[in-house]
């Protein structure tokens, strides 16, 4: 402040030295004796903190890349197993750590990815670490019973509602499909063998609307028809082949693949969460549209039914649907949770199979290391440099991983603690102290689940606190989840994503996820991090010469 003393606003990497120096000066100003360290004795510690963090980051995440201070971690898509050029391209564009998600693919695919990377390293002369991300306990929705198969065709219309291109469908034998990419409808009989150009196939669709499809082409395996109306057919829909006023033959639609269904949920709805072996189903209503049997869906983790309590919150599909547990039932019908839905995005949201479940208030008594994780860990120790622990919540989870690594004689393996739930945030000091028994550790701010668990409104605050605490512990941080996601998926970043990418430069590493435009995102992120290198490090502005100010004086 006015005395020229430190505001304590940027003391993380040298906390004790800063406090000692400020106290020493205050005692001198107050003409009081000071028994602690003198100011000159703290000088070395100011530089030591930053150098310790830099050393730990180099050991855990690799050397600092040319031109920037921050490493880039890239998640491997499945196609990388069969595309060595893709991995080489990532490496040339600035990838410093290759992330393999053990929740996808398998050891054969992972080994090919590793081989491709090692070959690319040899060809380019660029080193790259490998991180294996353990899947952890699977907490997801179970399957939903499929609905009846249905096929819909629809013509193309202009802005005036006029048909510009009629719908084209091909009636073909069951199990066959036309060589063209048009919509195929299987039939039980051989209507296509009797059809001729100019014929009409008459049917009544699922909505009771008559449709006349005009035959425009016929070959030995299909008859191709056009129609300028939308239509829906299911298995058993009757077909009548007409030639002028004459009926040539009759047929019916054959077996159709069952449709994947979803549950439509709105605020105020009831939802039953059951064990995963019971298929989910939508709510059932009576003739007055009153629900007499609520929607239900399975949960993949059985410990939920023993550890969850009434009044606790529950979220589905990255927070798109939220609710409160009203009751926990265990009887002859099995274990289940009765949930009252409290919010759904856009008023009504669809819940599908294999969507994430978050229970921020529930203390689940389940190990962060599953049996599959232990098998994957053995592979990771042979081929990788880092292993990321998912679903970590307690110091015991970290201790179990350390013990498993010692059993595998993999003391050199780096540990990444994924902070992705509320309990991990609350226990972060204890998690760090446990992990710091090892020399090579880092922390990942996994903002996907973390945002759901702690609330999106607290996300900015919590990620800052994680950065500060880890800097005080001299532990490197990986900034992860949805970094430049719009750019990676759609080829164009949002404005907020650009700011987020710039802010990520205060961590030691930034993680990019998968997407069709990931190479573009890799270039973009590297450019942003290179530009921000001269402007800021951690919380400190570097006071680089500003081009804007220079231009203003011209």
Regions inferred by a protein language model and the residue ranges of each:
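Non-catalytic helical/linker scaffolds that mediate oligomerization, partner binding
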Residues: 1-554
